[in-house]
């Protein structure tokens, strides 16, 4: 009888179907650094992580919106010991050769042009060039500054996207 029960359990487990509810990818993004100085994003002087790019005509470039990363607590942590060091802002997300791609809106060929404005060498952030070096001491003064512009493509519609950033001090 015991053997019959074991055989029945094995047979039933082989016949049971499996179901998968959902699957996807998770990206983990972080830094290990000898110095820490947390930054907060500011747009037009206001602390926020939302950059409102406004409205732009098809095939046109929108207004420049300033985006600056400043020390959350300029007098705390290691923020005061950054003189002579480099702060690297690395970006990840839907980067293309032109900039940051649209992820959820209908304007599928539009993108954001994100350009550093007070880096050691100002540059556009793209898939092939996604890290920008700054004089680290700027984090407690003018900040690590960028400008963002919406570049409209030929398709009209809304634009929604997100990009992750990480600041490393060396």
Q: PLM features: what roles do these ranges have?
A:
Residues 3, 20-170:
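Mature extracellular/passenger domains of Gram-negative fimbrial/pilin and adhesin proteins
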Residues 1-21:
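Gram-negative bacterial Sec-dependent N-terminal signal peptides
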